[in-house]
Amino acid sequence: MEVLARFSGRSGEITIFEEPATGARLYYEAGVYQSYVLSGGKAGLAYVRLMARVLSGGSDVLLFGCGGGALASELHAGGARVLVTDDNAISFEIARRYFWMPHAVGCSVTDMASFLVTRSATYPAIGVDVGGPCFDYDAVLDEGTCALLRRRLAPDGVIAVNIACDSAEDSTPQRIATRLRAQDLDVWLCEDAPATREHNAVLVAHDGRARDDDITAIADTLGFHAHRIA
């Protein structure tokens, strides 16, 4: 691995690596790999590709969490207008300079809760990919935040939420899925198949059943097991 840059981040040192053989780049922060992006900006992680496929039907997409910007880049390339919010301004600089995120992708320096409270616009597609070292998903995606996400969702819209799990027994995705289900949304839990010790779970929530066949097909194609939350 070749080191391209180092930054001082709020959670610790940020290092950008490049694989000499492939040109793919990694975003490493305080001992945690945050992003893996293929040369040119395409998503290198299956969960990001899953989120991109699920959200791709929206003409306007709101994303929380920047990282390497691969999700925003994929959706922008598909013709969507994309707005990314992140409370760490350096994330946008890193995504554009080192991970090929287009300048046409809109950026807003704010945290998710503040954005949801202060904005009134609705969006047909909302993606949540926030996290980092010692991140508390239960605190950030509490009942109030899930209710606000629902309010910002346009009719027939879809929400995709990524949760990085520490173990196969991690029950965080189920708890947050239950909170979204309480907002009168149909919720699917998509997990790595089979779930490994450290894995990603993607929650997909929408307000009608027309998407269900698409969700299961996309999950199967990318190696995820999807089941509906009752």
Description of each model-found segment:
Residues 6, 21, 42-158, 167-177, ...:
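The AdoMet/dcAdoMet-binding core of the Class I SAM-like
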Residues 113-119, 140-144, 184, 210-224:
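A short, terminal or domain-edge coil/loop segment
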